[in-house]
Protein backbone atom coordinates (compact mmCIF):
# COMPACT_ATOMS: atom_id res chain seq x y z
CA UNK A 1 0.00 0.00 0.00
CA UNK A 2 1.15 3.52 -0.71
CA UNK A 3 -0.41 6.79 0.39
CA UNK A 4 0.64 10.02 -1.29
CA UNK A 5 -0.11 13.33 0.40
CA UNK A 6 1.20 16.81 -0.29
CA UNK A 7 1.25 20.24 1.32
CA UNK A 8 -1.23 22.99 0.52
CA UNK A 9 -0.15 25.41 -2.14
CA UNK A 10 0.57 29.10 -1.50
CA UNK A 11 -2.66 30.90 -0.68
CA UNK A 12 -4.66 27.69 -0.20
CA UNK A 13 -6.74 27.11 2.89
CA UNK A 14 -5.22 24.46 5.19
CA UNK A 15 -6.37 21.02 4.06
CA UNK A 16 -5.18 18.50 6.64
CA UNK A 17 -6.31 14.92 6.22
CA UNK A 18 -7.39 12.36 8.78
CA UNK A 19 -5.85 9.06 7.70
CA UNK A 20 -6.60 5.64 9.19
CA UNK A 21 -4.24 2.91 8.02
CA UNK A 22 -3.26 -0.59 9.06
CA UNK A 23 0.46 -1.19 9.58
CA UNK A 24 2.58 -4.21 10.49
CA UNK A 25 3.97 -2.64 13.68
CA UNK A 26 2.28 0.31 15.40
CA UNK A 27 5.18 1.02 17.74
CA UNK A 28 7.79 1.02 14.96
CA UNK A 29 5.56 3.26 12.82
CA UNK A 30 5.01 5.71 15.68
CA UNK A 31 8.73 5.81 16.45
CA UNK A 32 9.57 6.51 12.79
CA UNK A 33 6.94 9.26 12.65
CA UNK A 34 8.19 11.01 15.79
CA UNK A 35 11.77 10.82 14.52
CA UNK A 36 10.53 12.79 11.52
CA UNK A 37 8.81 15.48 13.58
CA UNK A 38 5.36 14.03 14.31
CA UNK A 39 3.67 14.63 17.67
CA UNK A 40 2.06 11.70 19.48
CA UNK A 41 -1.68 12.14 20.02
CA UNK A 42 -2.56 8.65 21.32
CA UNK A 43 0.03 6.27 22.75
CA UNK A 44 -0.12 2.66 21.48
CA UNK A 45 -3.16 1.05 23.09
CA UNK A 46 -4.57 -2.48 22.80
CA UNK A 47 -8.32 -2.48 22.28
CA UNK A 48 -10.81 -5.24 23.04
CA UNK A 49 -11.63 -5.92 19.39
CA UNK A 50 -8.10 -7.15 18.65
CA UNK A 51 -6.26 -4.09 17.34
CA UNK A 52 -3.38 -2.05 18.72
CA UNK A 53 -3.94 1.62 17.86
CA UNK A 54 -2.02 4.88 18.08
CA UNK A 55 -2.40 8.36 16.61
CA UNK A 56 0.02 11.08 15.63
CA UNK A 57 -0.09 14.45 13.91
CA UNK A 58 2.59 14.97 11.29
CA UNK A 59 4.45 18.25 10.74
CA UNK A 60 2.02 19.20 7.93
CA UNK A 61 -0.96 18.88 10.29
CA UNK A 62 -2.32 15.53 9.07
CA UNK A 63 -3.79 13.29 11.77
CA UNK A 64 -2.79 9.64 11.35
CA UNK A 65 -4.57 6.73 13.02
CA UNK A 66 -2.39 3.65 12.80
CA UNK A 67 -3.82 0.23 13.56
CA UNK A 68 -2.13 -3.13 13.89
CA UNK A 69 -4.35 -6.20 13.85
CA UNK A 70 -3.20 -8.35 16.76
CA UNK A 71 -5.87 -11.04 16.97
CA UNK A 72 -9.27 -12.12 15.71
CA UNK A 73 -11.89 -11.89 18.45
CA UNK A 74 -15.16 -13.78 18.19
CA UNK A 75 -18.36 -11.89 19.11
CA UNK A 76 -18.93 -13.72 22.41
CA UNK A 77 -15.39 -12.97 23.56
CA UNK A 78 -15.72 -9.36 22.44
CA UNK A 79 -18.84 -8.95 24.59
CA UNK A 80 -17.01 -10.42 27.58
CA UNK A 81 -14.01 -8.16 27.04
CA UNK A 82 -16.11 -5.02 26.90
CA UNK A 83 -17.35 -5.86 30.39
CA UNK A 84 -13.79 -5.59 31.72
CA UNK A 85 -12.62 -2.35 33.30
CA UNK A 86 -9.34 -2.36 31.34
CA UNK A 87 -11.20 -2.44 28.01
CA UNK A 88 -13.47 0.41 29.05
CA UNK A 89 -10.49 2.48 30.22
CA UNK A 90 -8.65 1.84 26.95
CA UNK A 91 -11.65 3.00 24.90
CA UNK A 92 -12.08 6.09 27.09
CA UNK A 93 -8.40 6.93 26.70
CA UNK A 94 -8.45 6.52 22.92
CA UNK A 95 -11.66 8.52 22.58
CA UNK A 96 -10.48 11.19 25.00
CA UNK A 97 -7.20 11.79 23.20
CA UNK A 98 -9.08 12.22 19.92
CA UNK A 99 -11.53 14.67 21.48
CA UNK A 100 -8.68 16.65 23.00
CA UNK A 101 -6.75 16.75 19.73
CA UNK A 102 -9.73 17.76 17.61
CA UNK A 103 -10.42 20.60 20.04
CA UNK A 104 -6.90 21.89 19.33
CA UNK A 105 -7.54 22.26 15.60
CA UNK A 106 -4.84 22.65 12.98
CA UNK A 107 -3.31 25.57 14.87
CA UNK A 108 -2.42 23.10 17.62
CA UNK A 109 -0.38 20.99 15.23
Predicted regions and their residues:
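Vicinal oxygen chelate
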Residues: 1-57, 67-109
Amino acid sequence: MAVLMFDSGPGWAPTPAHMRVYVDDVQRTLRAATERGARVVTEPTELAFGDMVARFRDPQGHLWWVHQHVEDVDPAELGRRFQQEAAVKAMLYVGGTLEQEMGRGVAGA
